[in-house]
Amino acid sequence: AGCIAPGKTGHSRGKLDVRAVRGPLTLKELRKRFNVSPVPFGDPALLMSQMYVLPANQAIHEYGLIPHWIDAGLAVIERMKTLGVKIIDIRQPTQSLILELASVKKVLSSSLHGLILSDALGLPNARVRLSSNVIGGDFKFSDYCLSVGREHSSTPLDDKSTISKLNQIKFNDHIRWDADLILSSAPWNHE
């Protein structure tokens, strides 16, 4: 749905049938290399809101942390566990993931799709940086934030972070996007 970094479109040549993109930065990159017309913005993972609803009154943890897979083995993960933060692996089966997300009040994530899924399900969330290992840096996060009208910010966490630091993080709890616009751009609506 989007470029990972400037100049990284995932395609080197050929014709692309682009119906929607993650955000304006991706569209700009695609327009540099391909003859791509303006299309709607929105990551398809936001459509999870059309398929799943979080079970009500299940939150038993103040915070959940969704680390990017590349951050999964870091010492900061163990530190977060000692602070009572629920560690959530986004790679698990969808139904299990939804139940784990229902068990938290707020989501911290170094994974873009952790933020997107949290937004789709209406969970307050914030981007955290656990390392500099996530490919693409801020690009894909900025692209997404621009597409849903939210401020892009991130908070670095490490193995010395405290609950006080977590309590000071500003969480995003509202985005602007149009599911119908994304759905109407799907190929089956244009055959």
Predicted segments, located by residue:
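Active-site anion-handling motifs in enzyme catalytic cores
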Residues: A1-E191
